[in-house]
Amino acid sequence: MAVTANVGTIFPVVWAGDRVQLIDQTRLPEQYELREITTAAEMATAIRTMIVRGAPAIGVAAAFGMVLGAREYRGSDREGFLIHLENIASQLRQTRPTAVNLFWAIDRLLAAAQQPTPTLEELQQHLLETAQTIAREDVQTCQAIGKNGLGVLPKTPEKLRLLTHCNAGALATAGYGTALGVVRAAWAAGRLERLYADETRPRLQGAKLTAWECVQEGIPVTLIADTMAAHCMQRGMIDAVVVGADRIALNGDTANKIGTYSVALAAKAHNIPFFVAAPLSTIDTSIATGAEIPIEERHPQEIYQVGFSRITPAGVDFYNPAFDVTPAHLISGIITELGVFAPVDLARGIGAVSG
């Protein structure tokens, strides 16, 4: 039976004393369940199996995974501790190759580990405080993205009908959400008539997670199959599209959940603005274009099996990329915590605002 009762404010990754509590997103919407993670290896498994997912949330989870790994060290010398921490970082880096926030958070923890402290215990505490700061900053970042996104949405009609793909909500971040942060801001401002959510095959994050989040807060949501998005645009049912991102190249090319590119093409064909909402940490300044973004491929079972039932005949081959890359020319604006940038101005813009 689906969970429909309000579970309160959604925080998918929480430090709880000496462990991490994760909302098990593989169980939603049928069951709201918290998983307790006590080791770095357990965190790596949780990220790989998508118990926790969404680029910013993965980053926060990886940061706490580093903290758990640091607490597993049984030696007493700092050099051995740093080697141990590098090994933990290597394990976590191998979990999901596309989401750049994962690598950003791990690198931030490794940098924090260079902080001179009198004892290893104090260094471990410093790592925990750094991870908690990442989580806290992410919520604040998402709220700023929501505010900035609200400001760039079409001025007419007064009540907007927005479309989103996958889940870029509270479940995909430390809380509030990126694309759904914009939706939440529009709803709070009285500017949202309805959210249309693509179901997002093959893992159905839109159907299972985005719809669930909306139900928790009473946001009017209509679920559609991925193949219906262009039809809805053609019928004049969509005023703007807002999606999240897992990695953005310097030229604005954006990797997001598979199917996003198709939505962007349809939006362009119907002159509907298509926005990407993401924190600056999702922008990979080391790559020039989307051609350099590694695309994760997942097990074909996600395609051929629904629940416990196989839906395809034996002998069929499968191709299951988890992400696609939307070219920058299809994107109307990239909504960040520090403002909204046209893709062509992204590199110059982030340089200006970051000093």
UniProtKB/Swiss-Prot annotation:
| Annotated protein name in UniProt | Methylthioribose-1-phosphate isomerase
Q: Which HAMAP family match?
A: Salvage_MtnA
Q: Which GO terms describe its molecular function?
A: S-methyl-5-thioribose-1-phosphate isomerase activity
Q: Which organism is it from?
A: Thermosynechococcus vestitus (strain NIES-2133 / IAM M-273 / BP-1)
InterPro entries for this protein: IF-2B-related, IF-M1Pi, IF_2B-like_C, Initiation_fac_2B_a/b/d, M1Pi_N, NagB/RpiA_transferase-like
| GO biological process assignments | L-methionine salvage from methylthioadenosine
Gene3D superfamilies named among the record's database cross-references? translation initiation factor eif-2b, domain 1, Translation initiation factor eif-2b, domain 2
Q: According to its UniProt record, which protein family does this protein belong to?
A: Belongs to the eIF-2B alpha/beta/delta subunits family. MtnA subfamily.
Q: Where is this site: Transition state stabilizer?
A: C166
Q: What is the documented function of this protein?
A: Catalyzes the interconversion of methylthioribose-1-phosphate (MTR-1-P) into methylthioribulose-1-phosphate (MTRu-1-P).
Q: Which UniProt keywords apply?
A: Amino-acid biosynthesis, Isomerase, Methionine biosynthesis
- Pathway as given in its UniProt record: Amino-acid biosynthesis; L-methionine biosynthesis via salvage pathway; L-methionine from S-methyl-5-thio-alpha-D-ribose 1-phosphate: step 1/6
Residues holding substrate: R53, G54, A55, R96, Q205, N256, K257
Q: What is its EC number?
A: 5.3.1.23
| Active site, UniProt feature | D246
Query: What catalytic reaction does the record list?
Result: 5-(methylsulfanyl)-alpha-D-ribose 1-phosphate = 5-(methylsulfanyl)-D-ribulose 1-phosphate
Please report a single Pfam family linked to this protein: IF-2B
* Gene label: mtnA
